[in-house]
């Protein structure tokens, strides 16, 4: 079984993220004493030649996840450029393996620190190792090296003219690279793959544009209810109809008078107050309508009042006693302007149940009471 790798030019965002992660990995932990400043990645190029994978074992193979053991071989043209500052005075460096002045009789250099900038170029990587590769659509890519992958790397620096320093830098950089392949590179690949998986998931939604804002609809006036857009009261309105230009918009009117009337109506329903203002499209059963006709009263006032269902009248005599004459009280000018609707209670019942002050002041006449029970 063979694989064909698609190894295109990586995006600028990928290079930027990889450089930031390499900066963090190279400056982690204790650096050699010859390094006098932080290590910064200046240039990163992934090259044009892909690595080679030889299948050794397939452990898990599903639609969303793949796990296998491979033999990785890479001999491409990728390169890396680093920038840092080093301690150039060999006597200030306490390593016994640097002997720059071998054979000198007694000539010594100054023991003052001498920090100079340095550029490092790492190229011609040769990698060969057994790796465990796990590819998951949800968790990303996990790559673990089972053996030391670094076989060879060419390191060019500012001090290539000095052979001793060039060998020392070569040895130090190779040690740092082996540690990075073993500890830091699997984490870098995993974090980069998580960003790649996240971009794959979010990519279909990036092409979708948000829906256009809904234009503000006009608020209908009370006079618009009689037009074509009015729905019949026998059937409820269809709120899900796709009418491009609705005539009626079910929104509260921003009228202070209407709000005040609704507040009065709500207050009267809570307190059972009969003094409620009449509202259009509302029916209040506490009082009859207050419309005034040409005769001074409404048409409902001219007919006989309907007595309440719970009203009960108890009469002790066989016939209704003649009503007592009540002196007419002249109406005041204020009352003459507003006619009073007829009462639903009989005056005889009111005289019987609500007696005058004189009747309450003296004891009742038993004979008169009996005469009412047994009329002659």
Swiss-Prot record:
One of its GO terms (cellular component) is ERMES complex. The lineage of its organism: Eukaryota, Fungi, Dikarya, Basidiomycota, Agaricomycotina. This is Mitochondrial distribution and morphology protein 34. Component of the ER-mitochondria encounter structure (ERMES) or MDM complex, composed of MMM1, MDM10, MDM12 and MDM34. Lacks alpha-helical transmembrane segments, suggesting that it resides in the membrane via beta-sheet conformations similar to those predicted for other outer membrane proteins and porin. Component of the ERMES/MDM complex, which serves as a molecular tether to connect the endoplasmic reticulum (ER) and mitochondria. Components of this complex are involved in the control of mitochondrial shape and protein biogenesis, and function in nonvesicular lipid trafficking between the ER and mitochondria. MDM34 is required for the interaction of the ER-resident membrane protein MMM1 and the outer mitochondrial membrane-resident beta-barrel protein MDM10. It comes from Laccaria bicolor (strain S238N-H82 / ATCC MYA-4686). The keyword Heme does not apply. GO terms for molecular function: lipid binding. It is found in: Mitochondrion outer membrane. Belongs to the MDM34 family.
């Amino acid at each position: 079984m063979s694989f064909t790798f698609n190894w295109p030019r990586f995006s600028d965002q990928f290079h930027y993220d990889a450089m930031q992660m390499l900066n963090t990995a190279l400056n982690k932990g204790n650096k050699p004493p010859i390094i006098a400043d932080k290590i910064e990645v200046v240039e990163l190029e992934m090259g044009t030649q892909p690595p080679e994978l030889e299948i050794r074992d397939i452990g898990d193979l599903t639609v969303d996840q793949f796990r296998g053991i491979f033999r990785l071989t890479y001999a491409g043209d990728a390169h890396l450029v680093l920038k840092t500052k080093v301690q150039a005075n060999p006597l200030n460096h306490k390593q016994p393996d640097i002997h720059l002045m071998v054979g000198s009789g007694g000539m010594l250099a100054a023991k003052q620190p001498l920090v100079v900038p340095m550029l490092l170029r790492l190229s011609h990587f040769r990698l060969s190792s057994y790796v465990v590769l796990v590819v998951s659509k949800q968790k990303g890519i996990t790559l673990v090296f089972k053996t030391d992958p670094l076989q060879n790397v060419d390191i060019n620096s500012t001090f290539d003219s000095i052979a001793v320093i060039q060998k020392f830098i070569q040895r130090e950089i190779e040690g740092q690279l082996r540690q990075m392949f073993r500890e830091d590179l699997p984490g870098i690949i995993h974090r980069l793959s998580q960003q790649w998986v996240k971009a794959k998931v979010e990519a279909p939604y990036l092409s979708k544009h948000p829906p256009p804002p809904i234009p503000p609809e006009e608020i209908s006036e009370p006079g618009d209810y009689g037009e074509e857009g009015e729905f019949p009261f026998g059937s409820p309105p269809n709120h899900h109809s796709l009418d491009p230009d609705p005539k009626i918009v079910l929104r509260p009117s921003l009228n202070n008078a209407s709000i005040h009337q609704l507040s009065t109506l709500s207050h009267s329903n809570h307190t059972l107050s009969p003094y409620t203002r009449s509202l259009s499209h509302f029916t209040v059963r506490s009082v009859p309508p207050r419309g005034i006709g040409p005769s001074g009263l409404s048409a409902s006032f001219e007919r006989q009042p309907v007595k309440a269902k719970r009203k009960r009248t108890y009469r002790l005599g066989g016939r209704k006693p003649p009503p007592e004459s009540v002196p007419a009280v002249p109406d005041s000018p204020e009352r003459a302007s507003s006619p009073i609707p007829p009462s639903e209670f009989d005056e005889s019942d009111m005289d019987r149940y609500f007696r005058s002050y004189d009747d309450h002041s003296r004891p009742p006449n038993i004979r008169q009471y009996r005469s009412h029970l047994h009329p002659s």
